[in-house]
C-alpha cells in the first residue's frame, strides 16, 4: 500500500477514487510518566515519553487507515493528512485520512 501526501502517486495514473480512508486511535498518558515529564517540563528539554506516545499513535492511525483502504480495494492513499485532538485531560486522538484510489 502506497501512502503519499501529494495528489497523485508519482509514476502512476489514478483510475478511480474509492472514497475516504481513515484510521484513528486514542492514546492516554500514564500517571507515573506524567510525574517525570512534569519535572522535565520545569527543567526544560524534550518530553520524550510524550513524543514516543504520539509517534506510536501516528503509526497506529496510519496502519488503520491503510487497512481501511485495503478493505475498499485500493492500491494507494493520496492526500494523506494527520490530525490530533484532545479527547480528555489525559488522552489525545490521532486520525489519519486520505483518498483511497486505484492505480494503473
Curated annotation (Swiss-Prot):
Name of the protein in question: UPF0145 protein NP_2600A
Lineage: Archaea, Methanobacteriati, Methanobacteriota, Stenosarchaea group, Halobacteria
Cysteine-cysteine disulfides: none
Superkingdom of source: Archaea
InterPro entries xrefs: UPF0145_dom_sf, UPF0145_YbjQ-like
PANTHER family in the cross-refs: UPF0145 PROTEIN SCO3412 (PTHR34068:SF2), UPF0145 PROTEIN YBJQ (PTHR34068)
Name of a matching Pfam family: YbjQ_1
Family affiliation: Belongs to the UPF0145 family.
Amino acid at each position: 500500500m502506497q501512502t503519499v501526501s501529494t495528489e497523485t502517486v508519482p509514476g502512476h495514473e489514478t483510475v478511480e477514487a474509492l472514497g475516504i480512508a481513515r484510521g484513528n486511535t486514542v492514546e492516554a498518558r500514564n500517571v507515573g510518566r506524567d510525574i517525570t515529564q512534569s519535572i522535565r517540563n520545569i527543567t526544560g528539554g524534550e518530553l520524550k515519553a510524550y513524543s514516543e506516545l504520539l509517534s506510536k499513535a501516528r503509526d497506529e492511525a496510519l496502519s488503520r487507515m491503510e487497512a481501511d483502504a485495503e478493505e475498499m480495494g485500493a492500491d494507494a492513499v493520496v492526500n494523506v493528512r494527520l490530525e490530533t485532538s484532545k479527547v480528555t485531560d489525559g488522552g489525545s486522538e490521532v486520525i489519519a485520512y486520505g483518498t483511497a484510489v486505484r492505480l494503473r
